[in-house]
């Protein structure tokens, strides 16, 4: 099988590339990535040595380019990780989110239709459901929860999901959608909570926490997410949505304190900053459907996953130090320095 992985130089996409190459040595993996700030070719350094892997630089919203790629490579499956994904950035500049997350999705699906009704999987997010109240721990997102977005980012992803479902109903394109909870693990770009806190703590820098740190997220180790997506593209029911959750709910403050404890740092590093607009209170996914239909369950407990993640950052300092010393530093200062 030949799999086209878009956004494969990013965090989850690169982990999925390695998952496929490791578990299916006879399959071919093509990585298409625009190499924006969150894409990093160094992440794919090991994959580049594999004869079954090919990297292509390009934009999923470039219709002519995508058309040419499909004509030459003829993939059997497309897994779309390519997305602008940071909520704060979407508040600063929504336009690029609409272009990549919505237009890019339509361009990919049009190519799938044109070149043989190719199997298409959309990687989405639990943020399309909005949020849940902190005082109702009995509530969870299911696949039938109405879409109720809170940011330009989540609105763009929800729009893409609706477009995918429309292509299934209108054109009979063989599609599936997965909606995951917050991921963590190797190769995570250090603008997101866990890698940001690890990098800052290692450098004895302040750990900026929005509001009082009471917002709750369900954490999913990235390898578990990859195994779920692999199951869906190989055994999932066409036209269906699958929620992928980690059964690991934590407040943001609990996550930060766990990292501090593992690194033997002081809680004095914690600095509470002004909350962002429309900050969702709680995300919690019910993954019953994917468990019942495909037999999937998350294998990694949060405490184990966070230790593995910290160990990875300790042994790959050159990878993330290059990132935080570049363009990201200006963005970081803008977002946190004066809040």
Identify the residue ranges that each predicted region occupies.
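N-terminal Rossmann-like NAD(P)+-binding domain of SDR-like oxidoreductases, especially those catalyzing
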Residues: 1-183, 308, 313-318, 322-339
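The catalytic Tyr-centered alpha-helix of NAD(P)H-dependent dehydrogenases
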Residues: 137, 149-156, 186, 190-194, ...
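Short aromatic-enriched loop/helix-cap "lid" or pocket-rim segments at secondary-structure transitions
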Residues: 41-44, 132-135, 188-191, 255-256, ...
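Residue-level recognition of oxygen-bearing side chains
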Residues: 65, 96, 103, 189-193, ...
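C-terminal substrate-binding subdomain of Rossmann-fold SDR/epimerase-dehydratase oxidoreductases
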Residues: 16, 22, 29, 35, ...
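Hydrophobic alpha-helix immediately C-terminal to the catalytic Tyr-X-X-X-Lys motif of short-chain
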Residues: 159, 163, 167, 197, ...
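Residues that form or flank phosphate/diphosphate-binding pockets in enzymes
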Residues: 12, 38-39, 64, 188, ...
